[in-house]
Amino acid sequence: MTISRSTMAQILDYTLLGPEVTNSELAAFIDSAIELGVGTICVPNSMVNLTAKAQEAGIRVATVAGFPHGKTPALVKAAEARLAVQSGASEVDVVLDIAVVKEGDANRLLQEIVAIREAVPSPVVLKFILETAVVSDEAIVTAVNALIAAGADFAKTSTGFHPAGGATVEAVRVMASASRGRVGIKAAGGVKTWEDAVAFVEAGATRIGTSNAGAILEGAPE
């Protein structure tokens, strides 16, 4: 597969989510995002209101809810998502209750996803994190089908914070096969090089979450 640098840049969700991020670090990150030409930045919920410069440059602003453990009630995640949108976010990456994903409980998944979707209707883009490193392929398929049924926009592999690891090509293939184009697929966690990113796109990813956007794009072929 041949992918241009500019196309890859638009696929990237360039991420800065550490708990210690300062305002000055965020400002430098936004300058970097503009210089790199990425499509989206993903920043802490409390800092969305500081991203006007990125928005003015045409960069989409994403944030997170229920992050990184997913162990808050759905209505709390919904409130987080609503606040993020009010602050200027156009996309929210939500961590599902990973135990429910792991159990393959479609009804409980639907209840959670619908509650959040109703709080932030389309055109806000909702991506739901499955933490694929700790769930079975069967559970991944169940979760993807629930996301489709509930009107989600993306299934996302990982938070990037779980000790079990991040995205794998195999998990992305399972997600893409289940989705058949009905929701986008975001690979995140451990994507560090151009070759990594291309492999995930070839497996079916339509977005790449990474804190390594500069290194990835530096690896683009001439």
From Swiss-Prot:
The keyword Ubl conjugation does not apply. Catalyzes a reversible aldol reaction between acetaldehyde and D-glyceraldehyde 3-phosphate to generate 2-deoxy-D-ribose 5-phosphate. Belongs to the DeoC/FbaB aldolase family. DeoC type 1 subfamily. This is Deoxyribose-phosphate aldolase. InterPro entries: Aldolase_TIM, DeoC, DeoC/FbaB/LacD_aldolase, DeoC_typeI. It is found in: Cytoplasm. GO terms for cellular component: cytoplasm. HAMAP family: DeoC_type1. GO terms for biological process: 2-deoxyribose 1-phosphate catabolic process; carbohydrate catabolic process; deoxyribonucleotide catabolic process. One of its GO terms (molecular function) is deoxyribose-phosphate aldolase activity. The lineage of its organism: Bacteria, Bacillati, Actinomycetota, Actinomycetes, Mycobacteriales. The keyword Cytoplasm applies. Keywords: Cytoplasm, Lyase, Schiff base. SMART domains: DeoC (SM01133). It is an enzyme of class 4 (lyase). It catalyses: 2-deoxy-D-ribose 5-phosphate = D-glyceraldehyde 3-phosphate + acetaldehyde. It comes from Corynebacterium glutamicum (strain ATCC 13032 / DSM 20300 / JCM 1318 / BCRC 11384 / CCUG 27702 / LMG 3730 / NBRC 12168 / NCIMB 10025 / NRRL B-2784 / 534). Its EC number is 4.1.2.4. It comes from the Bacteria. Its main location: cytoplasm. The active site is at 93 (proton donor/acceptor), 156 (schiff-base intermediate with acetaldehyde), 186 (proton donor/acceptor). NCBIfam families: deoC.
